């Protein structure tokens, strides 16, 4: 399969947004599993760790694994930081690093978990899912957590836009999509200018607002996972090759959309090989320091 004119397996691909897709991850989603199966129109079931690694190997990606913790809201056991750290250590040729997860609603416990994730487990940074976690990142009560993360000098990846979690269910299972409005990232970026923030997903229905934030805030970059590339809005397609060519990065949201489809549709967007190299690894290496990052750093 080609990306531009480059054989995909000859090009480095850093997948910034990759879930474990094993039983601990499925269980961590609690009541949202049924809604996800309906949203993606397929079974939402776990694979073995060996099967997941085989998927990533076949795709030729260097995965950034994502932990998951929304325990306060759902009571579901987290897909823990220890778990993704072990997967990283067990599969160094496939899993480049891993994003930690802490539940902001846990207060001081979240701060302690954050320190442990970086200092002891040597994880890369933190991922947050505001809709499922029932919080907005610009709420002042969570600022002690952001101050801690800022002091740890690691990046955060924050979901923007609507989600399949709870979609179509009565009341969305209590999830509120405004929690993932790009305006919250705009405020957080302004209040913590040294914090590197990666916005995750295109941000629909607020793609124009997310474009504005990415253009305005120097410490905000953007990965476009969880969305079939052929459905990217025209404004995003233009700015990928224009004003945001040095800020857009690749993520899959595995296991949401098959890698073959994602790569095929990125290829069909018709971008130059030089731009694709930036999107699929160069920007992540430069912005996030991944060219020197390792699991032992």
Where are these regions (language model features)?
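A general structural detector for well-ordered alpha-helical segments in enzyme core domains, enriched
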Residues: 51-55, 80-88, 113-117, 141-145, ...
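Mid-to-C-terminal alpha-helical segments outside catalytic/metal-binding sites
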Residues: 2, 6-62, 242-249, 257-297
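Conserved, mostly hydrophobic/aromatic
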Residues: 17, 56, 84, 126, ...
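A cross-domain feature marking catalytic cores of carbohydrate-active enzymes
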Residues: 18, 65-68, 100-104, 127-130, ...
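Short aromatic-enriched loop/helix-cap "lid" or pocket-rim segments at secondary-structure transitions
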Residues: 24-30, 77-78, 111-113, 168-171, ...
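Catalytic pocket-lining loop regions of alpha/beta-barrel enzymes
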Residues: 123-125, 138-249, 296
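Active-site environment of divalent metal-dependent phosphoester hydrolases
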Residues: 21-24, 71-73, 104-108, 162-166, ...
């Amino acid at each position: 399969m080609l990306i531009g004119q480059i054989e995909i397996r000859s090009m480095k691909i850093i997948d910034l947004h990759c879930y474990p897709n094993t039983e601990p991850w499925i269980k961590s989603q609690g009541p949202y599993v049924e809604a996800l199966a309906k949203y993606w129109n397929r079974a939402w079931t776990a694979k073995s760790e060996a099967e997941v690694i085989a998927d990533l190997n076949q795709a030729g990606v260097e995965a950034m694994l994502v932990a998951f913790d929304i325990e306060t809201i759902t009571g579901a056991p987290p897909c823990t930081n220890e778990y993704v750290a072990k997967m990283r250590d067990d599969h160094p040729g496939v899993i480049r690093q891993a994003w930690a997860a802490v539940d902001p609603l846990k207060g001081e416990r979240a701060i302690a978990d954050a320190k442990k994730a970086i200092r002891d487990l040597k994880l890369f940074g933190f991922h947050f899912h505001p809709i499922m976690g029932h919080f907005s990142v610009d709420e002042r009560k969570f600022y002690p957590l952001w101050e801690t993360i800022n002091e740890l000098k690691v990046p955060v990846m924050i979901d923007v836009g609507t989600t399949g979690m709870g979609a179509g269910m009565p009341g969305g299972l209590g999830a509120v999509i405004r929690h993932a409005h790009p305006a919250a990232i705009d405020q957080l970026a302004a209040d913590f200018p040294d914090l590197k923030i990666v916005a995750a997903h295109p941000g629909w229905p607020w793609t124009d607002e997310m474009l504005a934030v990415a253009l305005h805030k120097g410490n905000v970059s953007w990965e476009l996972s969880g969305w079939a590339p052929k459905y990217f809005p025209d404004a995003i397609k233009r700015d990928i090759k224009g004003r945001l060519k040095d800020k857009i990065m690749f993520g899959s949201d595995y296991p949401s959309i098959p890698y073959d489809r994602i790569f095929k549709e990125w290829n069909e967007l018709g971008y130059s090989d030089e731009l694709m190299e930036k999107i699929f690894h160069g920007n992540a290496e430069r912005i996030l320091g991944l060219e020197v990052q390792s699991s032992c750093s």
